Amino acid sequence: MLFADIILPLSLERNYTFGIPIELHDKVKVGCRVEVQFGKRKVYSGIVKKIHANKPEYYQVKPIRNLLDIEPIVTETQLKFWKWMASYYMCTEGEVMNAALPSHLKLVSETFIVLNEDIEIDAQSLSDDEFLLIEALEIKRSKKGVE
């Protein structure tokens, strides 16, 4: 099985390795964007930095979900420059990627919190923080209804 080291648009000390599904073996190239799941639910577009056959020992590899580019959008020279910039400016390659790529090339999932109108909430049983959160969500919902 092949693996890819992916630069994620996050402030991470290192890049993470993802598995390349068999159907993408011939298509994934260094410099292409791929869609990966990082964490339990977050989905990001990352840049393939390196392709290899070394399975990580300390964590379970997740597969690349999707290939976003047919051809690389970043050259190997640019990737080397990003690494140099990260070292020189004491930041991560993910932070350099965030600054270097236009926002429409970055895929980031978002989490939305909404009230379930079918559930009745007992305000007496809520902690102070829970009460404030519910109150803020109710205010936001009422403002949407006005517009």
Placement of each model-derived feature along the sequence:
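Accessory, non-ATPase domains that flank or precede helicase/AAA+ motor cores in DNA-metabolism machines
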Residues: M1-E147
